[in-house]
Swiss-Prot record:
Disulfide bonds: none annotated. It is an enzyme of class 2 (transferase). One of its GO terms (cellular component) is cytosol. Its main location: cytoplasm. The active site is at H45 (proton acceptor), E72 (proton acceptor), H193 (proton donor). This is Pyridoxine 5'-phosphate synthase. Catalyzes the complicated ring closure reaction between the two acyclic compounds 1-deoxy-D-xylulose-5-phosphate (DXP) and 3-amino-2-oxopropyl phosphate (1-amino-acetone-3-phosphate or AAP) to form pyridoxine 5'-phosphate (PNP) and inorganic phosphate. Pathway: Cofactor biosynthesis; pyridoxine 5'-phosphate biosynthesis; pyridoxine 5'-phosphate from D-erythrose 4-phosphate: step 5/5. Transmembrane segments: none annotated. GO terms for molecular function: pyridoxine 5'-phosphate synthase activity.
Length: 243
């Protein structure tokens, strides 16, 4: 079986810091701990309203990360310019609404093909690997291919939020089919959103999945067990699922 990689999203360390307007806990420190615990990359979402990760965080993390930065961002001129200046290894283009608590669904690539293709081409020309955060839908996967994106990240939120085991199994089948279809097109497949210690194994077991991006569950577990153990435990579950 191929390896599977873990990108640790540290947004909610910044959420905790910003709740009191303090300098702690510092997501830069969190990234260091996560890397030592086995994270293969660090994911951060610089939102337009800067509700958690800030420009300062992006700048310092770019200088200090020992693994790779995956910068999640909306498809706006401001964010594209920040990415071009920062030069992260990866950019994941995501939909964004100011009123949402977290990203609610996949990017409608098919409905905004020209705009997303232009952004993808601009970032790619700068040497940045582009991923598109989409639902496991053939139309969206085809559109991602048409944009020239080498990566997609399949939205696992519907799987994670399924009300029954039967519904969850249906969502897993959709993700598995989408991952297989994308891989056949030559696209590298990541996945994430809503994954926890209890539901991650079936997703991690899918052979086409290259990397999982997980944040909220890890930071939540870290409150009780410490961040190092929380990251290491998640990585262990993922690796075991691939055996």
């Amino acid at each position: 079986m191929s390896s599977i990689y873990l990108g640790v999203n540290i947004d909610h360390v910044a959420t905790l810091r910003n709740a009191r307007g303090t300098k702690y806990p510092d997501p830069v420190h969190a990234a260091e701990v996560a890397e030592r615990a086995g994270a293969d990359g660090i994911t951060i979402h610089l939102r337009e309203d800067r509700r958690h990760i800030t420009d300062r965080d992006v700048r310092i993390l770019r200088e200090t990360l020992q693994t790779r930065m995956n910068l999640e961002m909306a498809v706006t001129d401001e964010m594209i310019e920040i990415a071009l200046k920062t030069q992260p290894e990866y950019v994941c283009l995501v939909p964004e609404k100011r009123e949402e608590l977290t990203t609610e669904g996949g990017l409608d690539v098919a409905g905004h093909l020209d705009k997303i293709k232009a952004a993808t081409e601009k970032l790619t020309a700068a040497g940045i690997k582009v991923s598109l955060f989409i639902d496991a839908d053939r139309e969206q996967i085809d559109a991602a291919k048409a944009c020239g994106a080498p990566f997609i990240e399949l939205h696992t939120g519907h799987y994670a939020d399924a009300a029954t085991e039967a519904d969850q199994l249906d969502e897993l089948k959709k993700i598995a089919a989408g991952a297989s279809y994308a891989a056949d097109l030559g696209i590298t497949v990541n996945a994430g959103h809503g994954l926890t210690y209890h539901n991650v194994a079936p997703i991690a077991a899918l052979p086409e999945i290259y990397e999982l991006n997980i944040g909220h569950a890890i930071i939540g577990r870290a409150v009780f067990d410490g961040l190092h153990k929380a990251v290491a435990d998640m990585k262990a579950i993922m690796v075991a699922a691939r055996q």
